[in-house]
Amino acid sequence: MNQPPMLDIFRSTGALLEGHFKLTSGRHSNTYFQCAKVLQHPEHLSAVCHKIAAHFSQKGVDTVISPAIGGIVAGTETGRQLGVKTIFAERKDGRMTIRRGFSVAPGEKVLVIEDVITTGGSVQEVIELLKNAGALIIGVGCVVDRSNGKVRLTDDQYAVLSMEVVSYAPEECPLCKEGMPIDAPGSRANQQP
């Protein structure tokens, strides 16, 4: 699956949106990737996660972890394809935590899976949790890298679709200056002012 067919899948499923969006990172953009609309289809979910799993299959992964909520579906399927434990981290009181009886042991080889990387903030929070637990970060896999590889979180980072998509600090957003209404479809949209 190379990038043009992947873009076609995003378009055909209604997952590639155009307009004025507040991203989970807080930045603004005229393009939004709603990965859930792609990953809700088993054939797309399997194909996308197969690419990620194949990239990391020789790394000795013990566990896959994803930041909630966006990365959970891709993380679970990638873990299933690798045949390893799959967990997620979630926010409590504004901080990323590992809860619900999940745990990571010192020396455990962990792969972080996210749906979309823009600034890498959520993934970086998960990486810090893992480091504090003494885990070994094997790499980061994602469905979409909006930075086209400019945001580097680990030595081994893989994206199924990588392209540079412009984003703006809110105070520099030309769409705001034009008075265009903004939509905040991300998983933290209702948690941020």
UniProtKB/Swiss-Prot annotation:
CDD domains: PRTases_typeI. One of its GO terms (molecular function) is orotate phosphoribosyltransferase activity. It catalyses: orotidine 5'-phosphate + diphosphate = orotate + 5-phospho-alpha-D-ribose 1-diphosphate. Gene3D superfamilies: 3.40.50.2020. One of its GO terms (biological process) is pyrimidine nucleobase biosynthetic process. Its EC number is 2.4.2.10. NCBIfam families: pyrE_Therm (TIGR01367). Catalyzes the transfer of a ribosyl phosphate group from 5-phosphoribose 1-diphosphate to orotate, leading to the formation of orotidine monophosphate (OMP). This is Orotate phosphoribosyltransferase. It comes from Chlorobium phaeobacteroides (strain DSM 266 / SMG 266 / 2430). The gene is pyrE.
